[in-house]
Amino acid sequence: MLQYLNKNGKIHLLSENNINITEDNISSYPIIFICNNQYLQLSSNQINYIAKHIKRGGFFIIDNITSDYTYSLFIQQLMPEFEKEAIQIENIFNNMIFDLAFEENPFESNGIFINEKIALLGIKDFSLLDAWNNENEEFLRLGVNIIFYYLTR
């Protein structure tokens, strides 16, 4: 994904895998992407750090949510003062660097908006990471648009 972003979006980002989120280092990660149900393994301190980070402008993406119930509990713990809203990706992430051409919404997603900007994006029963690893062009374009959205809003 990052190579595609660099080559086609002319945006250069670094990534780290398996970070240990602490109060001291979280600001080093403006975009935090967590896969599957790994959000369930976060400590209460890490959840508090992420909540503060999101409120300060960080972007938190949860990929491939498999349980509405546990996800709802997590969101309530993370950001109790905000309501999650349904997100139609083609309405928000289209016409940035790339025009997206999905025949229909490829997955269900929701998020939390702060100051009219998506601060948390939850993707249900679909893995963007897998689509990127499989070099699916449409989802690589979507990934570039998501990052561009974050950087320009």
Go through each PLM region and give its residues:
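Short, well-ordered loop/turn elements at secondary-structure boundaries
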Residues: 28, 55-56, 114-116
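Residues at alpha-helix termini
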Residues: 7, 55-56, 81
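Surface-exposed patches in mature extracellular/periplasmic domains of secreted proteins
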Residues: 9-21, 62-65, 86-92
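Aromatic-Pro/Gly-enriched surface loop or interdomain linker
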Residues: 1-31, 35-38, 119-120, 127-128, ...
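Alpha-helical scaffolding within the catalytic cores
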Residues: 16-21, 43-49, 103-109
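An acidic, glycine-rich "communication" segment
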Residues: 67-149
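Short alpha-beta junction capping motif
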Residues: 31-71
